[in-house]
Amino acid sequence: MSLMNKAVSRFRTAGWLEKAGYSPWLYLYRNLERGQVMYSQLPEYGERNIKTQFKRHQWENKTPSLRRDIWRVMCVVQMPNHQDSVQVYQNLCRLRYMRDVLYREEAQKHRKLNDKGQVWYSGQYRPTYTQEAVADLKESIDKSGSAGPVTLVWEDMWRMGERSVWEELDLEIKHRALPKLGNVIRDEHAMLKQLQLESLE
């Protein structure tokens, strides 16, 4: 693992993030090949994100690659302060561990399965994982204790699911769309930097 990968994927405290000048945000990255979702506290990700969030390598949920061309930002979660952003990140990681390790059999019962009892897929892509990540994001924000407001910036607005589900939360949540990308790798970095600049205005 490179030193850069170690640096960007290490867990960060609220104090560190604030001192380093990062906005109180977290990032959900979608795997274009398999539908898996990875969480990051920084607008980057590394090997440790993979190792800590994908604990159980198996045929239905193989440990994903770090290749930059297969990950795209699905959602940028803009929390009101760094403590809230860290709490939501920790909640997401705990829910992932519960789904994949502690209560895997129970979680499987609620997933769309094919006639062989496997998580439904098309090619290698399993939409269940992105749907679960959105559900877990809602739960994580709800349990964070945040007073809001929270802004969710989506890759596509339809990924948020039903707006009425988000309106159940007892805090102000705004939804908007990320700018459309051309060259995914180059433009995505520029777009995330632009979001950071907008937050400082």
Swiss-Prot record:
Keyword check for GTP-binding: no
Keywords, in A-Z order: Mitochondrion, Nucleus, Ribonucleoprotein, Ribosomal protein, Transcription, Transcription regulation
Protein location: Nucleus; Mitochondrion
Classification via InterPro entries: Ribosomal_mL67
Entry's Gene Ontology BP terms: cellular response to oxidative stress; mitochondrial genome maintenance; positive regulation of mitochondrial DNA replication; regulation of DNA-templated transcription
GO molecular function, one term: structural constituent of ribosome
UniProt xrefs under Pfam families: Mhr1
Protein's UniProt keywords contain Membrane: no
Function: Transcription factor involved in regulation of RNA polymerase II-dependent transcription. Also involved in regulation of mitochondrial DNA recombination, maintenance and repair, and generation of homoplasmic cells.
PANTHER family for the chain: LARGE RIBOSOMAL SUBUNIT PROTEIN ML67, MITOCHONDRIAL HOMOLOGOUS RECOMBINATION PROTEIN 1
Family to which the UniProt record says this protein belongs: Belongs to the mitochondrion-specific ribosomal protein mL67 family.
Protein name: Large ribosomal subunit protein mL67
